[in-house]
């Protein structure tokens, strides 16, 4: 499709989320796991990024943004999936219609902090390894496993915790995330800090939602990501909300 179009009239974006979820079994309908529900919210966040764009050029609209900014709209949307107030709107027993009990909501929230210290260290190790590999200037006769061990030893990584992906099967570093694997954790910093604004003013607060829409979702890649974020939040992103939500603070 051409990136050029006639200048008269509005062109409405068309976005479709296609998901592969748990199939129905016999007379039992498709019942989504909590992970699948979060995936649905996540992908709809990407959809909103495309639907609400006000950019004039396709190449900088919607999700056509920096790699370390693209997951903010999707990951912040995941937060609503497990907010108790939202859960009670849709989490119903498929036979009785009974609303999910508070005891089960508590378990869903508690599992979010399980093993997060281990997981965060894995991700950080892989991100640093990715950066180190892309800082190499001479790769002749490089023993990648020996290099990985040396890099991890310098970090003080204990043998029980390895990088999330070992060098020999680290597909991200040659599949679009070269020197960019850190963006997964950075996006988590952004989405947790951004959602903190909603928690401060109410998770359905229209003013906060409009700020996010006007300064992030509509803007695409038309301005520097940090400028857009600060226009929304009023400050640079803080690390504390991510650490708190991972049970590490």
Give the residues covered by each predicted segment.
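Cation-handling catalytic/transport regions enriched in His/Asp/Glu
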Residues: 1-249
């Amino acid at each position: 499709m051409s990136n050029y179009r006639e200048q008269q009239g509005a062109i409405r974006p068309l976005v479709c989320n296609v998901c592969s979820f748990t199939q129905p079994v016999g007379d039992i309908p498709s019942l989504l796991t909590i992970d699948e529900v979060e995936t649905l919210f996540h992908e709809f966040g990407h959809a909103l990024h495309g639907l609400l764009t006000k950019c004039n050029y396709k190449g900088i609209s919607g999700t056509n943004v920096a790699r370390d900014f693209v997951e903010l709209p999707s990951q912040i949307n995941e937060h609503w999936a497990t907010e108790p107030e939202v859960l009670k709107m849709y989490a119903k027993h498929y036979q009785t219609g009974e609303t999910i009990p508070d005891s089960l909501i508590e378990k869903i929230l508690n599992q979010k902090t399980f093993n997060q210290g281990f997981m965060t260290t894995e991700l950080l190790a892989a991100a640093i390894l990715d950066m180190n590999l892309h800082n190499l200037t001479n790769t002749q006769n490089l023993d990648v496993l020996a290099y990985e061990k040396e890099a991890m030893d310098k970090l003080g990584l204990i043998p029980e915790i390895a990088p999330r992906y070992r060098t020999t099967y680290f597909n991200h570093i040659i599949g679009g995330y070269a020197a960019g694997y850190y963006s997964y954790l950075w996006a988590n910093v952004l989405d947790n800090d951004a959602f903190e604004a909603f928690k401060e003013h109410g998770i359905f607060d229209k003013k906060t939602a409009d700020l996010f829409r006007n300064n992030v979702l509509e803007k695409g890649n038309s301005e520097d990501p940090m400028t857009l974020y600060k226009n929304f939040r009023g400050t640079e992103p803080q690390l504390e909300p991510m650490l708190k939500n991972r049970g590490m603070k």
